[in-house]
Amino acid sequence: KARGRIAESINANDDEIFFTSGGTESNNWVLKGVAFAAKKEDKNKNHIITTKIEHKSILNSCKWLEDNAGFTTTYLDVDKDGFVNPEDVRKAITSKTILVSIIHGNNEVGTIQDIEAIGKICKESKVLFHTDVCQSYSKSELDVKKQNIDLMTLNAHKIHGPKGIGALYVKRDTRIMDWQQGGSHEKGMRSGTENVHGIVGFGEAVKIAKNDFKKNNKYISELRDKLIKGIMENVENVKLNGPDIKENGNKRLSNNVNFSFSAIEGESLGGYLDQKWVCSSTGSACNARTLEPSYVLKAMGLTDEEANGSLRLTLSKFNTEEEIDYVIKILPKIVEKLRYISPIGKVVNYFKKDKKE
């Protein structure tokens, strides 16, 4: 039943859904499974196309294939809002290309790519197209047939399901090697005892998300827009990272807010917010322990200072308008305090002239 619900949610067939431990495993399986299947058939087929702002599980899998199996990768640039130009995909495809892998909704800045246009280009070029929809699942309309998608990565916990369970959609007749050898689990493609309780929870989460899709996204988008507007109006020298909500609100994930604050570090800002019971992040959850500037923001053209001053706030249907008001109330005071004690803030003088130092 869970397999059927997931398949129905993306307009796929039940037998095209394979359960995994999550998005990272699904992404690894796609890259390596497609790569080795292609190489087995034709040794000259060794080229992969992706972008500079993909999830680490894609970028690191590409690097592994480069270092250990003789594959090459083209990493496409993105614009200042994180969009990849579909025509850049077309230009990058060669006779050796086996796969194009582009994330649908970016996990840091919320940019939603035009996967339908990219999928059409891949279909015309007879190249497999994979997209990671972990962030956009339940927040955007997905249709593997309409959007010409051959492989799709999904997971449960981003839609309030259990952790440790994900899925991979593989279009019928797509050449991909089995991921684990052993028994006959998952039609012999991914051996190992299935996470039954996780699968059931995944299916239930899909059911709930489908029933409340429009209502939840409208509500969360309104919270997002209020938070963005409130911060922009009450904090000086702040930059919204990702698509502008006025021009491209429908091309930004409904739950994503990402700002860069001049003259302070996002890490410090996040620490103060944590003391006020506000959860935040300075980048992707998978990269949160590193002190390096976000590679996603750097790829979008931000300076090290701008990237280090970034803060991400992620919303859900469980957030309230009162919580948004609370963040808008406390954040400006925290930013002002951090700028006051920051050496950078003193040098560039971000304070109004009539304020006392």
Question: What residues fall within each predicted segment?
Answer:
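Pyridoxal 5′-phosphate
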Residues: 1-357
